[in-house]
Amino acid sequence: MTFNVNVLTIFPEMFPGTLSHSIIGRALNKGLWNLNVIDIRSFAKDKHKTVDDRPYGGGPGMIMKADVIGSAIDEVLSKNKNTKLIYMSPSGIKLNQDISGQLTHFSNITILCGRFEGIDKRILDFYDFHEISIGDYILSGGEVACMVLIETCVRLIPGVVSNTQSIRDESFTLDYKLEYPQYTRPAKWRGLEVPDVLLSGNHKKINLWKANQSYCITKQRRPELTGTIDGDIYE
């Protein structure tokens, strides 16, 4: 099953952007996932291709128009009525690895990228959108957040990352722990040495060290995640 992604944006030239590089770009070229970028502005009816207007009730900035966005969404739905609709929003559920994994089970998703002060709320009321946030901060638009979401999903598609163990060992993938420290050659650098256990060849001890490091780092930096981990085996 190919993972198909539709992106609704007023800046189609931003795509594929970073998604055309490295393993994500190679997967795109191989057809492991498809990208369909739709210019919202092309659905505006006036000669100026207006996509925004002043907010009712006053307030700063401009709001993206429901009629224009709605026409763009209808175009997507006419070709795939079962596409999963997603709106990148700081008010949404915070993205995590589990959400990304769930989204890869859909053959077609559509991501709406807002701009200005946001979109007319009636879009979210009329269509079955799922709002997703990539963090507690504000960006100028949804395009960068959209690329983050796409990359987190595409990496989980079978065949994209050649070493599946890399996926299993990454932060948040296994029991929501942060990843353990990594080292490579040389064994000594500027007075700093690789931990002896990693040079021992004893895989049982190495695995225990990795698990312990992962747990301790998670407990120190993201203590809210340790509630999902059985700490008795690490402490």
UniProtKB/Swiss-Prot annotation:
PANTHER family: TRNA (GUANINE-N(1)-)-METHYLTRANSFERASE. It catalyses: guanosine(37) in tRNA + S-adenosyl-L-methionine = N(1)-methylguanosine(37) in tRNA + S-adenosyl-L-homocysteine + H(+). CDD domains: TrmD-like. S-adenosyl-L-methionine binds at G114, I134, G135, D136, Y137, I138, L139. The keyword Iron-sulfur does not apply. It is an enzyme of class 2 (transferase). GO terms for biological process: tRNA N1-guanine methylation. This is tRNA (guanine-N(1)-)-methyltransferase. It comes from the Bacteria. One of its GO terms (cellular component) is cytosol. Homodimer. It comes from Ehrlichia chaffeensis (strain ATCC CRL-10679 / Arkansas). It is found in: Cytoplasm. SUPFAM superfamilies: alpha/beta knot. Specifically methylates guanosine-37 in various tRNAs.
